[in-house]
């Protein structure tokens, strides 16, 4: 009997990726079906369904699911879900009952098939207000929703591919079944997920080590899908994180892995989604720091912590591990948090993303109190290869790694 948290919904993992003869047969059938091009976000969502990360979904959401999730975190069947998982199109001719091949618009690869059970329109501004708390087109998540097609399509899917994530990231691209097997092998049952879309600096290292003190282990779980233009690419982040783990974490306390979603930058709602799919990966806790999954000033620094107290009790088995803002304090002589350090901001070493970017692009060393030298070297190498124009666009934001 597994001691790990159960997958979301309380049943078994439900990966929708076909294998063997079923995969060969469906691929052959898909080749003759009308094609629907998916955005990067939609492709990532489909792959998550394929590997079981979005258990127990069996496809893209219906209008009543969309409405229920937007307005009350609940699908029609009563399942807790914090963000709509939808597929859109501008194609007027598609109708209920149609069978479609789902194609990654960027690569042209057929990623899955779908039987359309519902074609509907939505109030995009309503989704933005409910999920992102704003309709400001400067918000990358709002921009993404507003760029969707005129219609949403719902229906069960069969997944045929996970794209090139395995080829690009090798063992780091782990499915929920694989992380669960690894946790079992390690004898772990209390596992904290550390969500990251950035390289890990000293403050992130400190957060993970706080969790290690009370947990069996930590899953450092990096986003491998698309970010905002200018964010550091996943392969560079992965190398920087691996370098930190190899040099500064005790053996058998951390597993590094990645997942295929794009960032939505939905702040509190995205923190709930992060906890939900970490439950499928086998994690009992999600570390939630300052400004988790946020962007700009759209959310309060700890809104993503507060939202866990606002959802119905028992919605998720994976629970939040709240940790305050962390930094190096000169007077304390080490890493500290707002909760433990009595000193003023003048005693704290805080670097803005702009400052970090400027130092790295000029080949300067970052303060050792801010970043480990081995990590800084990985980033310096990346920045050295950028043109001046690219350099301006690269962003390192927020004190949270999320």
Curated annotation (Swiss-Prot):
Its EC number is 2.7.7.4. Pathway: Sulfur metabolism; hydrogen sulfide biosynthesis; sulfite from sulfate: step 1/3. It catalyses: sulfate + ATP + H(+) = adenosine 5'-phosphosulfate + diphosphate. Keywords: ATP-binding, Nucleotide-binding, Nucleotidyltransferase, Transferase. This is Sulfate adenylyltransferase. GO terms for biological process: hydrogen sulfide biosynthetic process; sulfate assimilation. Belongs to the sulfate adenylyltransferase family. GO terms for molecular function: ATP binding; sulfate adenylyltransferase (ATP) activity.
């Amino acid at each position: 009997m597994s001691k790990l948290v159960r997958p979301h919904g309380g049943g078994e993992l439900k990966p929708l990726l076909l294998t063997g003869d079923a995969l060969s047969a469906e691929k052959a059938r898909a080749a003759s079906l009308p094609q629907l091009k998916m955005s990067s976000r939609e492709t990532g969502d489909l792959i998550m369904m394929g590997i079981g990360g979005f258990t127990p979904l069996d496809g893209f959401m219906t209008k009543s699911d969309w409405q229920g999730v937007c307005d009350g975190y609940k699908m029609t069947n009563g399942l807790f879900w914090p963000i709509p998982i939808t597929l859109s199109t501008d194609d007027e001719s598609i109708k209920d009952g149609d069978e479609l091949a789902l194609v990654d618009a960027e690569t042209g690869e057929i990623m899955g098939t779908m039987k359309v059970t519902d074609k509907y329109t939505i109030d995009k501004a309503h989704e933005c207000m409910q999920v992102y708390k704003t309709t400001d087109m400067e918000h990358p998540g709002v921009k993404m929703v507003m760029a969707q097609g005129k219609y949403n399509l719902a229906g069960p899917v069969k997944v045929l591919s996970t794209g090139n994530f395995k080829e690009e990231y090798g063992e780091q691209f782990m499915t929920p079944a694989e992380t669960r097997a690894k946790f079992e092998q390690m004898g772990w049952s209390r596992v904290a997920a550390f969500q990251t879309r950035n390289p890990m600096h000293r403050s992130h290292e400190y957060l993970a080590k706080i969790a290690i003190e009370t947990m069996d282990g930590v899953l450092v779980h990096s986003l491998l899908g698309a970010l905002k233009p200018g964010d550091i690419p996943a392969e560079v982040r992965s190398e920087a994180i691996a370098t930190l783990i190899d040099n500064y974490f005790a053996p058998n306390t951390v597993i590094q892995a990645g997942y295929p979603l794009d960032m939505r930058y939905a702040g509190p709602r995205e923190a709930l989604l992060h906890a939900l799919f970490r439950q499928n990966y086998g994690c009992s806790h999600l570390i939630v720091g300052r400004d988790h999954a946020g962007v700009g000033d759209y959310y309060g620094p700890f809104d993503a912590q507060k939202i866990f107290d606002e959802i119905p009790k028992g919605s998720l088995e994976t629970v939040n591990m709240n940790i305050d803002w962390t930094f190096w304090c000169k007077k304390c002589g080490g890493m500290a948090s707002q909760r433990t350090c009595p000193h003023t901001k003048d005693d704290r070493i805080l670097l803005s993303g702009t400052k970090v970017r400027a130092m790295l692009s000029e080949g300067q060393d970052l303060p050792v109190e801010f970043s480990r030298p081995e990590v800084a070297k990985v980033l310096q190498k990346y920045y050295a290869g950028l043109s001046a124009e690219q350099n301006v666009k690269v962003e390192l934001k927020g004190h949270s790694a999320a």
